[in-house]
């Protein structure tokens, strides 16, 4: 198996290194990741300047761009072969519910999915890298399952509780939950007395009932959510056609 690995925390992130170490024994891996933390960059591509590719002493490639840039350049400019799978992570912090729209971790996987390649995004619930070896072991378990019964070009979002491997409950299929709207921005002043703003924290859980990613991970399960690119609101499509008729 040939696997492309990326992330949004940067090429030096412990989660990326742990994921690469876990998958190297079972696959030929290529790692292409941002040069720095690009959390929250979503699916953005850098179009206003050229990008540069560097290679670290451990063989990892790193790019002064977004996670989507990294996967795009890896597939169209660096790799001499087409990978069988793209994995992203392991992210420091959850990517559940509305988080998936902003997540650079999910975006890296999505970019590969857009190229017709199966992709999986891996995230830990809590920041701080606690139980990272456990999360990496879960990632390897999931990659080895192959998911032959899924459509050929699947896109999965995996969230892993920060628990010892032996304490984790079995992985379950989930849907995305929902959050309340984000908290207000945090206003401050720079050294020159000018107003500056920090984006506020994410909103709390709004839809976290049974069957959601929020609920599953709260019970100690690994959550696996199948994602899709089509954002069409099909329930409103027929009504809109009537309005426009």
Curated annotation (Swiss-Prot):
- The positions making up the signal sequence are none
Query: What InterPro entries does the annotation carry?
Result: SurE, SurE-like_Pase/nucleotidase, SurE-like_sf
What top-tier enzyme class does this entry carry? hydrolase
Which residues does a divalent metal cation bind? 8-9, 39, 91
Known HAMAP family for this protein? Answer: SurE
The record's comment on cofactor binding reads:
Binds 1 divalent metal cation per subunit.
PANTHER family, A to Z: 5'-NUCLEOTIDASE SURE, 5'_3'-NUCLEOTIDASE SURE
Family statement: Belongs to the SurE nucleotidase family.
Which EC number(s) are documented for this chain? 3.1.3.5
Q: What is its main location?
A: cytoplasm
TM spans, by residue? Answer: none
Protein name (database record): 5'-nucleotidase SurE
- What exactly does this protein do? Nucleotidase that shows phosphatase activity on nucleoside 5'-monophosphates.
Spell out the GO cellular component terms annotated for this protein, sorted alphabetically and separated by semicolons.
cytoplasm
Reactions performed catalytically = a ribonucleoside 5'-phosphate + H2O = a ribonucleoside + phosphate
Give the organism, scientific name.
Herminiimonas arsenicoxydans
Q: Tell me its cofactors.
A: a divalent metal cation
Cellular location of this protein?
Answer: Cytoplasm
